[in-house]
Amino acid sequence: MTSSVIPPSPSAADYAAEGDRPLVPETDNPIGLFQDWMAQARASEPNDSNAMSLATVDADGRPDVRIVLLKGVDSEGFTFFTNLESVKGVQLAANPVAALCFHWKSQRRQVRVRGGVAPVSAAEADAYFASRAAQSRISAIASDQSRPLADRAIFEQRVAEISSVYGDDNDIPRPPHWGGFRLVPTEIEFWQDQAFRMHDRLRFYRKADGGWATVRLYP
């Protein structure tokens, strides 16, 4: 079945015009490789190079996925923030495992991550919340994220009321229903597009001693 809205598969001429792409480099530091790829994506993506799909599961084992923004990555893991009473917040509290997927079209690259999830400290959540624009903080306070909204005007009125409370005061505290999570990776897979679907895949998986092992995968 075909559709006019779906682009056709690349032709041999299309692949020839694009040229060769590098393979995923061998390394014992997948976090460092991810940071390198993120830096390259930031320089080439039109916006939100830190956007990622976050997959969770509900109490019945049904999957959910949505786009969120990565706000930190280091040897401890991948950090993001959210309303803790949102669907994802509730699901992560009940079943603290998740998967991430980054797709950078400009680089023809993808990174998949799986692992356990833990809340960040209150101090870390406070620090990030304070770094946000004042109006974004007010919006976070006002939002009952994922719950039914009878009329957008209700939300806008709530934002206006909270804004009037703080006025020009930039000291807007983090509400208790807002915080962050850190995904501690057990698997990280790097994918690089190659001609004729001969894509390159390198998977890192955590060893018992805390180090990383690698395996290349068929595309």
Swiss-Prot record:
Amino-acid positions noted as binding substrate in the UniProt annotation, renumbered to this chain:
K71, Y128, R132, S136, R197, M198, H199
Which purpose does this protein serve, as stated in its record? Catalyzes the oxidation of either pyridoxine 5'-phosphate (PNP) or pyridoxamine 5'-phosphate (PMP) into pyridoxal 5'-phosphate (PLP).
Q: Which reactions are catalysed by this chain?
A: pyridoxamine 5'-phosphate + O2 + H2O = pyridoxal 5'-phosphate + H2O2 + NH4(+); pyridoxine 5'-phosphate + O2 = pyridoxal 5'-phosphate + H2O2
Which residue windows are coiled coil? none
Q: Which family does it belong to?
A: Belongs to the pyridoxamine 5'-phosphate oxidase family.
What is the protein's species of origin?
Hyphomonas neptunium (strain ATCC 15444)
Region entry Disordered: which residue ranges?
1-23
Listed PROSITE patterns = PYRIDOX_OXIDASE
Instruction: Describe cofactor binding as the record notes it.
Output: Binds 1 FMN per subunit.
Q: Which SUPFAM superfamilies match?
A: FMN-binding split barrel
Q: How does it assemble?
A: Homodimer.
One GO term (biological process): pyridoxine biosynthetic process
Question: What is the official name of this protein in its record?
Answer: Pyridoxine/pyridoxamine 5'-phosphate oxidase
Q: Which UniProt keywords apply?
A: Flavoprotein, FMN, Oxidoreductase, Pyridoxine biosynthesis
The gene from which this protein is expressed is pdxH
Matches recorded under Gene3D superfamilies = Electron Transport, Fmn-binding Protein, Chain A
Q: What is its EC number?
A: 1.4.3.5
Name the needed cofactors.
FMN
Q: Does the record bear NAD in its keywords?
A: no
Signal peptide coordinates: none
